[in-house]
Amino acid sequence: MAGGPPKALPSTGPQSLRDMPHPLAGSSSEEAVGGDSTPSPDLLMARSFGDKDLILPNGGTPAGTASPASSSSLLNRLQLDDDIDGEARDLFVTVDDPKKHVCTMETYITYRITTKSTRVEFDLPEYSVRRRYQDFDWLRNKLEESQPTHLIPPLPEKFVVKGVVDRFSEEFVETRRKALDKFLKRITDHPVLSFNEHFNVFLTAKDLNAYKKQGIALLSRVGESVKHVTGGYKLRSRPLEFAAISDYLDTFALKLGTIDRIAQRIIKEEIEYLVELREYGPVYSTWSALEGELAEPLEGVSACIGNCSTALEELTDDITEEFLPVLREYVLYSDSMKGVLKKRDQVQAEYEAKLEAVALRKEERPKVPADVEKCQDRMECFNADLKADMERWQSNKRHDFRQLLVGLADKNIQYYEKCLMAWESIIPLLQEKQETK
């Protein structure tokens, strides 16, 4: 990305929080509340901000004698853990093979989605369909409508700044493909979202547009109820555990935004330094043509600088393509979680308003109406699902950032090792010239 113009694209489930019982899964509301072993918000916050949040597998101790080999073996070990976890899965989805389509009215990219599963919900063991970005967007909207109590993974941002990024370049398409692949894999790993009817159709239907026009697939009972909740109810006070989650998400997004801005400034400076290196190296090469005895050492210095510039370009590309997208994904993730929190607050506000209205009735034998009980069920459902998704999100976050930071360290080690080898390679040449004198 740092060197030359962009290449053109050729045309053509985890358990819930502490196994917490769902309030609508057959147990009474009292049992669900009484048997709740959910960690306190302070514990969640400690997991998030404490040393365990982004701790490295080696305990976080400085590795003064670390080498690229040791860091690479660490990456391999993390990958092995993923393979072991994957042995228990029964649904695998992959996004690959992007293709550019040029039509009269528009130009767009489609991606091949390959699905392999042993679930009874699928008629065939394997499916292969092609989808474009707007199909992914449709899926996410449908999941939000039908599963409002759950955290829906974010999609990569659709729009890019015109003139800054070519959305049909090979680099941009590959970055988006990785993001879309991660989006589907997060849904696949979810114990509820992966069984959603819309998700099944998205993975299997040859003609998705026909399904969209039919407008079938009714909303769930909980989803339909939440959809009709108006914003006319005012929440008195948010429970402490959810207030702590909201505060954490605000701080988390702020920190990631700061890291993203600083990383982009570093990349900009590295690109400027790379331009200078590319002009600096050839100077020694042209100088060598004017020298006799110094010609070979000068050519060696020129080649050394060229190797260093290549290593720097690789490091810059890795940070741009691997590091920054993860930061932006989790900023969007925190926004999605805030959206679910707001929906939960609306349901709680509705429940409080209805409960207060019942209390104001002067009856000898007050009886809680059915609609109030249903509203209470929805609120407890929201609480349980949100807590479970928050724990799942925290677990994924720790895993993703562990891999991200280990990978960043590994790439930096490789960069400095390459520069060291390049400069060390010309030392014998310079010593040889000194001895000949």
Curated annotation (Swiss-Prot):
Which Pfam family name is an example for this entry?
PX
Phosphothreonine modification sites are: T38
BAR domain location is 234-437
Where do the PX domain residues begin and end?
A: 89-210
Q: Name one GO cellular component term.
A: early endosome
CDD domains recorded for this chain? BAR_SNX30, PX_SNX7_30_like
Does this UniProt record's set of keywords contain Transport? Answer: yes
Establish whether keyword Nucleotidyltransferase is in the entry. no
Q: Which UniProt keywords apply?
A: Endosome, Membrane, Phosphoprotein, Protein transport, Transport
Q: Which InterPro entries match?
A: AH/BAR_dom_sf, BAR_dom, PX_dom, PX_dom_sf, SNX30_BAR
The processes (GO biological process) annotated in the record are:
positive regulation of autophagosome assembly; protein transport
Task: Name the cystine pairs.
Answer: none
Gene Ontology molecular function: phosphatidylinositol binding
Q: Which residues bind a 1,2-diacyl-sn-glycero-3-phospho-(1D-myo-inositol-3-phosphate)?
A: R132, Q134, K162, R176
Residue ranges of the region described as Disordered: 1-45
In the bilayer, the protein is annotated as: Peripheral membrane protein
- The protein's predominant localisation is membrane
Which residue positions does Phosphoserine occur at?
Answer: S40
Protein family according to the UniProt entry: Belongs to the sorting nexin family.
What function does the entry list?
A: Involved in the regulation of endocytosis and in several stages of intracellular trafficking. Together with SNX4, involved in autophagosome assembly.
Protein name (database record): Sorting nexin-30
Q: From which source organism is this entry?
A: Mus musculus
Upper lineage is: Eukaryota, Metazoa, Chordata, Craniata, Vertebrata
